[in-house]
A protein has these predicted regions:
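Membrane-embedded, hydrophobic transmembrane alpha-helices
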Residues: 1-87
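Transmembrane-helix signature of polytopic, membrane-embedded enzymes
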Residues: 31-40, 179-205
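Membrane-interface alpha helices of multi-pass inner-membrane proteins
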Residues: 53-56, 208, 244-260, 264-271, ...
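Perimembrane helix-loop-helix junctions
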Residues: 77, 81-86, 265-296
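Active-site lumenal/periplasmic loops and adjacent helix-entry segments of GT-C-fold
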Residues: 102-193, 211-213
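Membrane-lumen/periplasm interface segments of specific transmembrane helices
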Residues: 107-109, 150, 289-316
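Multi-pass, polyprenyl lipid-linked donor-dependent membrane glycosyltransferases
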Residues: 167, 171, 194, 198-200, ...
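Membrane-interface transmembrane helices that cradle and orient dolichyl/undecaprenyl
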Residues: 186-188, 224-244
């Protein structure tokens, strides 16, 4: 695969992801700061996965389908840039970092499970619409990850299945930028949050830098670090921010779709629940928000896929 073509596709899809993140933040009224382009990126990953779950019921994720999806994403991205929601200077920085990450990713092999079931499952999504009973063909098909569905949207002419690790790279990239900003943010006076972000940045850089380490678990663990930072931020400010709580809920839901065992980390919400205590107005704002409605629908689609593949709602 030509390196220039690979980088061009990576950048185009990256901008599409950010565009969808901007769109989702508006729908859910999350009011993301213009400086938080990384959050737009993470939200874009979540929304594109949701779209992938939904559209695969009716259609395979072939070239035409994916070109339409990313054309809309680019339009959304350009509208965000035009309205100055996204700062142009940050785009250049992310673009340069993207090229570096793509080049370095080629130095290592793919994950050991990639050829076993990651590639076949994702390729099947690109060639066929939703099917029941896939778990009978391959043991790995019984544990579908949302990352396979996200990667299936990157099946495009000229690159084909060479993009089937892009999802992991985007999560890796957004996480590094997120923690880097937390470490060097002059407005952040929380030393514990800065120290934790530094440890997370070093850990991800050292342990997860090779593509061979990125199956599905590593991406979930990376996002889990972000969830913990958001929780620390809420608790340290001694201020309930429903926007951040909604963001935490979205991330926890997405973690469950990556690997079902991440469901145990819902317990991380306990400190926030203890912090809110009996403030029923805040509970009402959270439980009757668009975020909860979106999350319920997202989980319904995920467990429907899980049931269709393995016959179990929770597997293994």
């Amino acid at each position: 695969m030509n390196l220039i073509i690979l980088n061009l596709y990576y950048l185009v899809i990256l901008f599409s992801i950010i565009g969808y993140g901007y769109f989702l933040s508006n729908i859910l009224k999350l009011y993301i700061n213009v400086k938080e382009i990384v959050i737009f990126g993470i939200l874009g990953i979540i929304f594109l996965t949701f779209i992938s779950y939904l559209t695969n019921i009716f259609s395979p994720h072939g070239f035409v389908h994916n070109i339409i999806i990313h054309s809309i994403g680019i339009i959304l991205f350009l509208s965000a840039v035009k309205s100055e929601v996204i700062i142009k200077k940050k785009i250049y920085v992310i673009a340069i970092l993207s090229i570096i990450i793509v080049c370095f990713s080629l130095l290592s092999k793919t994950h050991d499970d990639f050829g076993w079931y990651h590639l076949p499952y994702t390729l099947n999504l690109s060639q066929n619409k939703f099917q029941y009973g896939l778990g009978h063909f391959n043991h790995g098909f019984r544990t579908p990850s949302s990352l396979f569905y996200l990667n299936s949207l990157f099946y495009l002419p000229g690159i084909k299945f060479y993009s089937f690790n892009f999802a992991q790279l985007y999560i890796f990239q957004f996480s590094l930028i997120y923690f880097y900003k937390k470490i060097f943010n002059k407005e952040n006076n929380n030393s514990f949050e800065i120290f934790y972000s530094l440890l997370a940045f070093i850990f991800i850089s050292v342990v997860f830098y090779r593509l061979a380490e990125h199956g599905t678990d590593r991406s979930g663990q990376t996002l889990l670090f972000i969830v913990i930072v958001l929780i620390l931020n809420i608790l340290s400010k001694n201020l309930v921010e429903t926007k951040k709580i909604n963001l935490i809920i979205l991330l926890l839901v997405y973690l469950i779709t990556i690997k079902t065992y991440f469901i145990i980390f819902i317990l991380l919400m306990l400190p926030i629940l203890m912090f809110i205590k009996k403030d029923y107005l805040i509970y009402k704002k959270i439980f009757f928000s668009k975020t909860i409605a979106f999350s319920i629908l997202f989980l319904f689609l995920h467990f429907h896929i899980q049931l269709a593949n393995s016959g179990c709602l929770l597997y293994p």
